[in-house]
Amino acid sequence: MSRPLSDQEKRKQISVRGLAGVENVTELKKNFNRHLHFTLVKDRNVATPRDYYFALAHTVRDHLVGRWIRTQQHYYEKDPKRIYYLSLEFYMGRTLQNTMVNLALENACDEATYQLGLDMEELEEIEEDAGLGNGGLGRLAACFLDSMATLGLAAYGYGIRYEFGIFNQKICGGWQMEEADDWLRYGNPWEKARPEFTLPVHFYGRVEHTSQGAKWVDTQVVLAMPYDTPVPGYRNNVVNTMRLWSAKAPNDFNLKDFNVGGYIQAVLDRNLAENISRVLYPNDNFFEGKELRLKQEYFVVAATLQDIIRRFKSSKFGCRDPVRTNFDAFPDKVAIQLNDTHPSLAIPELMRVLVDLERLDWDKAWEVTVKTCAYTNHTVLPEALERWPVHLLETLLPRHLQIIYEINQRFLNRVAAAFPGDVDRLRRMSLVEEGAVKRINMAHLCIAGSHAVNGVARIHSEILKKTIFKDFYELEPHKFQNKTNGITPRRWLVLCNPGLAEIIAERIGEEYISDLDQLRKLLSYVDDEAFIRDVAKVKQENKLKFAAYLEREYKVHINPNSLFDVQVKRIHEYKRQLLNCLHVITLYNRIKKEPNKFVVPRTVMIGGKAAPGYHMAKMIIKLITAIGDVVNHDPVVGDRLRVIFLENYRVSLAEKVIPAADLSEQISTAGTEASGTGNMKFMLNGALTIGTMDGANVEMAEEAGEENFFIFGMRVEDVDRLDQRGYNAQEYYDRIPELRQIIEQLSSGFFSPKQPDLFKDIVNMLMHHDRFKVFADYEEYVKCQERVSALYKNPREWTRMVIRNIATSGKFSSDRTIAQYAREIWGVEPSRQRLPAPDEKIP
């Protein structure tokens, strides 16, 4: 497995991040051997590369456990306010390298594996991604956990341990096929099952009203078993916990209905209960009102709240005896953050526990609930908003429906008092939507039941106040805040782009890794020839490495000197991968028209998954691959234009492609992308952005200066005006010859000669019912892309612009985001203080 060292690798050994201590390396080798033999029960004659990965993982994990136990002891002794981040998704990716980075073990492990004749990078590639998320929302939760640990907050991530995460995407004949993601097949060395904290969760049943109050009876019980994963902060010896619940049937499941011969069936039917945590719903920005999904949402909430209350009541470390019974202090000790409306049932569930079980009166319980809960909104797309049918809630959670009705009644009384006589406002603001199917609007429930409501970028938060939540803002303006999203610089710079992290550290030191605003110091290097050269060199090395990866994995040849033009994100009409396609075809047609004219060579890479039931998104993937089939095999084009669909885009692939990108495509219709976080990752890794004034792009352009950003297209106001006037695609088709040619090519089967009408649905949508107005931005987009190519011809000026972008990306650290949540929503103060290491005395 060992190979000669490249110059870059030899240079790594004189890293400013310090050499591996000899005794450290010896110790790691000893522990590696111990785990190979005693944990995995293998010797070198029968060990596979996967065994070596597991041995290394266990060796690294050993360095976490002392810190993990210490951290939890510290929290029990200090009893700080706890932060509970509730999310149906945590898109964690791989854990090994991130743990080594945060614990400063990377060099020592690299040296130890090298001395054992192993290649650490090859071992890292064996780890499965923990793909427990769809896209941005789940990845944000993962970045937030990293930042909360790095800022020393007593924080816990709570979610579901899906047996199957986001599907693996295979492209067959240009079409997306889904494959189950059996990520736990070989076991997960990072989790620790905690069966002793298993808790019951109730479903169905009925409500009995007694003199003591309401009782929820005759329920079906499913057990929630927690699995804990350590979350290390950056070099501060803090290790927090992500606790994921797995569904288990109770031992007496269905056996009370026991009849002769029924026993076997009863045992087989245990699967029905355990299906709750079987699979992640693969929808991004789309609501699918299925009973199993509602069960998942209640399952995580019910188990988590029991855990929160148990921890609140027992103030001593490891003690399960109730101590605190007064809930007045609950909001001073507990903050619950709802990541979108998916965990919104936390509000009625907390009310149920306080009123029915803890016997608080309604007003006191409501005060506690509102002070405890806060809600983050992630989208304004109407099809993404959760509206659960009343009949489903009535069957599955009858007591919660009653509580929601009571919340609604009291809420509407407040609205009526504040706006007397405004009947339509009552209808608009009700948690209950009347119609053919009566529904509960979960966003309205969250706003009513939270003390803070935030959007995830400044423009998004403004849109919330002016449009979908306008009525609520007028009632309670103090609730509404903005918290612009961020990304963790540990994973998204130090881990994925060590070359860039290194040359930055050589100029400004290493403190920027936990204080990203320090990147501003790089502004004084914009004209430094050596730094310009270094930045360009690192980018070229990353491009060569990614080109080699594509060749190895997909047998795809690309020109590493071409401009790497990258759009990677979920496939969705609002993200406008189709606009990108129109540009690619424009470039192709121009080359065909003037084959001898110089063009800046481009490799256009598009990647992302389509929800399995989203027909248009799947057609878009087929179109991208079809364009590639034509463009990549046209001898006239040569290597001046290549179109690559990146199969199975996921966290571990993002870590490879983002550092190699020259151009980042962030081209959603203004007003549709709440924030975006991929945009920030590209900026931090030295790509330039072409984008609309949408989501966080607005703030990125503000930080970098608009002259260092390729901005095009309609602003939100322009989109609104166009809506009022009526968007007519035909106007653009008639006026723009290049656009007309493309649509004719799509209609005539130019890109699908065996099936001429293959793309008729796409053409029909673009021409007649395109909600996202692709044609309206086409001309400006193509012109803006010409400016991109022109700048790319001047490598020095391009790199200077890159440096300005990197230097102004500090705002987009999730450390900044979390510090704002902490101070402005949770009422806690972040801290960069180190805990003592396990081998240090506690002061």
From Swiss-Prot:
EC number per UniProt: 2.4.1.1
UniProt modified residues of type N-acetylserine: S2
Cofactor(s) this protein cannot do without: pyridoxal 5'-phosphate
Activity regulation statement: Allosterically regulated through the non-covalent binding of metabolites, being activated by AMP and inhibited by ATP, ADP, and glucose-6-phosphate. The activity is also controlled by post-translational modifications including phosphorylation.
Modification sites for Phosphoserine: S15, S430, S514, S747, S748
Protein function: Allosteric enzyme that catalyzes the rate-limiting step in glycogen catabolism, the phosphorolytic cleavage of glycogen to produce glucose-1-phosphate, and plays a central role in maintaining cellular and organismal glucose homeostasis.
Name the UniProt record assigns to this protein: Glycogen phosphorylase, muscle form
Organism of origin: Oryctolagus cuniculus
